[in-house]
Every structure is written in C-alpha cells, then in structure tokens.
Amino acid sequence: MKNESTFIDVPAESSSAMKGKAPLIGVARDHTTSGSGGYNRGLAIFDFLLRLAAIVAALAAAATMGTSDETLPFFTQFLQFEASYDDLPTFQFFVIAMALVGGYLVLSLPISVVTILRPLATAPRLLLLVLDTGVLALNTAAASSAAAISYLAHSGNQNTNWLPICQQFGDFCQKSSGAVVSAFVSVVFFTILVVISGVALKRH
C-alpha cells in the first residue's frame, strides 16, 4: 500500500510541473509587446527627424517671404517703384502663419521625444495627431493663398486688367515663389507626420 501511495503522488508533481510552464506563455506575450514597442519607437524617431526638417522648411518660408523687398533703380519726383511682402495682405498672412507653424513645430519636439522614450503611450501620440492636423490646415491655407498671388504676379489676369509685375520685380517674385515652394514642402512633411501618428495609434 505504501508503494501505491507513492505512485499516487506522481500526478501531483506533474501538475506542479504544468504550473511551472505557465510563465512561458507570459514571456511569449512580452516578446510580442516589445516587438510592437520597437516598431513604434522607430516611427517616433522618424517623426522627430521629420519635425526637424519641417522646422527648417517653415522658418525658411517665413524668412524668405519676410525679406522679399525690391525697389526699382528709377523713380519719379512723386513716385518710387517698390514691391514688398507687406504691400499684400495675403503675403503678410503667409509670414505670420508660417512663423506660427515653425514655432509650433519647435514646441512639439519635447512631445515627440516622449513618444520615443515611451513608444506604447497613447496620449502624447494622440495629442500630436490632433495638433498636427490643425497646423497642417493653417500651413496649407497659407501656402495656397500665397501661391495664388504669386501666380498673378507672374501671369497677371487679362479679364481684370491685372498686369504681371515679375518682369520688373524679378528678385521679389523669385523670393516669394521660393517661399511658397518651401511652404508646400512643409505641407508634405506635415502630411507624413499625420500618417505616422495614425499608423502608430493603430499599432496600439
């Protein structure tokens, strides 16, 4: 009977062995979580680098437009022919808007760093998605309105008798056109940033 009791105790040991296998399942889940975290961290690093590039594009657009000023070498007794960004309200709006876009991007860098350090955190990524979408709209509005005025400066409008001025004010038009191109580059960067935030949130 003692030998039989000894054989009865064997299933108890096997059940404890089965309990010992339970942590292996938890370890497998941890590997899955760490894999997702590594993917999101890679997206966060790319997000940070894109923000640096967008800062350069936005501030370059504001600075270039803000310094677009040209005075023709000839003048009359009563008139001096000059073209400047502050002569056009649309270009004034462009300078202010792009400066705000650049300032926002600088302030968003710490939040982007948080997403690198905590790749699985949802709140900072969601905050960036909402703010980036709003600033993207402002950036697009500034770039589009300035592009329309720049087109009129180059081509004019025969229906309204608006004459092109870029033949006379070549430097002014070149600077303003460069600023518009830089602003649209910033729009592309912002679009990618919004997509990155959406993908990262979907991975959660």
From Swiss-Prot:
Residues 1-42, 114-125, 200-204 are cytoplasmic. InterPro entries: CASP/CASPL, CASP_dom, CASPL. It is found in: Cell membrane. Keywords: Cell membrane, Cell wall biogenesis/degradation, Membrane, Transmembrane, Transmembrane helix. It is a multi-pass membrane protein. One of its GO terms (cellular component) is plasma membrane. The chain crosses the membrane at residues 43-63, 93-113, 126-146, 179-199. GO terms for biological process: cell wall modification; cell-cell junction assembly. It comes from the Eukaryota. One of its GO terms (molecular function) is protein homodimerization activity. Residues 64-92, 147-178 are extracellular. Pfam families: CASP_dom (PF04535). Belongs to the Casparian strip membrane proteins (CASP) family. Regulates membrane-cell wall junctions and localized cell wall deposition. Required for establishment of the Casparian strip membrane domain (CSD) and the subsequent formation of Casparian strips, a cell wall modification of the root endodermis that determines an apoplastic barrier between the intraorganismal apoplasm and the extraorganismal apoplasm and prevents lateral diffusion. Homodimer and heterodimers with other CASP proteins. Interacts with CASP1, CASP3 and CASP4. PANTHER family: CASP-LIKE PROTEIN (PTHR36488:SF11), CASP-LIKE PROTEIN 1U1 (PTHR36488). This is Casparian strip membrane protein 2. It comes from Arabidopsis thaliana (Mouse-ear cress). The gene is CASP2.
